[in-house]
Regions:
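Interfacial loop/beta elements and low-complexity acidic/Ser/Thr-rich segments
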Residues: 1, 19-24, 210-212
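Conserved "repeat-terminator" motif of extracellular CCP/Sushi domains
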Residues: 10-19, 86-94
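Extracytoplasmic/secreted envelope proteins and their assembly/folding machinery
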Residues: 24, 34, 38, 51-58
Length: 249
């Protein structure tokens, strides 16, 4: 204490003890989810323990859309030599999930929407889904299929097929499309990458003109990233997307 200048130096001594480390992931009687969680985990056995990494694993498991509920927690009481096993409790979604909707609006009249998803087509985590929309001026149906590779969020293949019909005043059109895309992420980069190839064929009639058809083969690339600040209580965020397409008729 320096009384002459009213200043005191404070020395704080802290003995935090041994630093905990991550142990194995434990998922009871669920081999396919065990593999999925290990691929998504932002840590490995032996890494220094950080609570934020558990929150990140929890978030990633929810993003896969395989599970209705996710709990990730440390088993401190079961730790040995400061190595803490991680307990993962997962509640799977039903084998098939359906969303149905009906409505009426002044511009299109009655309309119907339907959505189907099957999160686990097989033990490899393939994901299938379909959507349908029906109204007087427009109808469409689409089907998509996702094949996880290194992980189910950032590295996967996806396939889409769809049909759309429109009848707007004096124009009637029918469009079919199929596409395939490869999505991947690069280590130490927050940019998500995808390359795609899309084939579209459209037939349309306008007024009294004869029927016309177009066919487009479109390859392309997309770069996107999602940023946020504030941790769990996000107070800022943005999404940036860059897409380049090249069409050949």
């Amino acid at each position: 204490v320096f009384e002459s200048i009213n200043v005191a130096d404070i020395t704080i001594l802290i003995q935090s003890g041994a630093r905990y480390k991550f142990g194995d992931l434990r998922i009871a009687n669920d081999t396919r989810s065990q593999t999925l969680a290990e691929r998504l985990a932002p840590f490995k056995t032996g890494d220094l323990y950080q609570a934020s990494q558990l929150g990140l694993l929890n978030q990633r498991l929810k993003q896969t859309q395989y599970f209705r509920h996710v709990i990730v927690r440390p088993l401190v009481a079961s730790s040995v030599d400061a190595v803490v096993p991680i307990d993962v409790i997962l509640t799977h979604k039903p084998r098939d999930n359906f969303d149905l909707g009906m409505g009426v609006s002044s511009d299109v009249g009655p309309r119907f929407t339907g959505k189907w998803q099957r999160p686990w087509v097989n033990d490899s985590g393939h994901f299938a889904g379909a959507q349908i929309y029906v109204s007087s001026p427009e109808q469409y149906v689409s089907f998509d299929y996702k094949v996880p590779l290194e992980d189910a969020i950032h590295n996967y293949l996806s396939y889409q097929a769809g049909y759309q019909a429109q009848n707007d005043n004096d124009t009637s059109s029918h469009k079919w499309s199929i596409s395939a895309s490869r999505h991947w992420a690069v280590e130490n980069s927050d940019w998500q990458r995808s390359a795609f190839l899309r084939l579209e064929q459209e037939t349309f009639i306008q007024g009294a003109e004869p029927e016309k058809s177009t066919r487009l083969l479109t390859p392309g690339f997309t770069f996107s990233r999602l940023r946020s600040k504030g941790g769990v209580d996000i107070n800022w965020g943005d999404k940036q997307t860059i897409t380049a397409e090249f069409a050949s008729e």
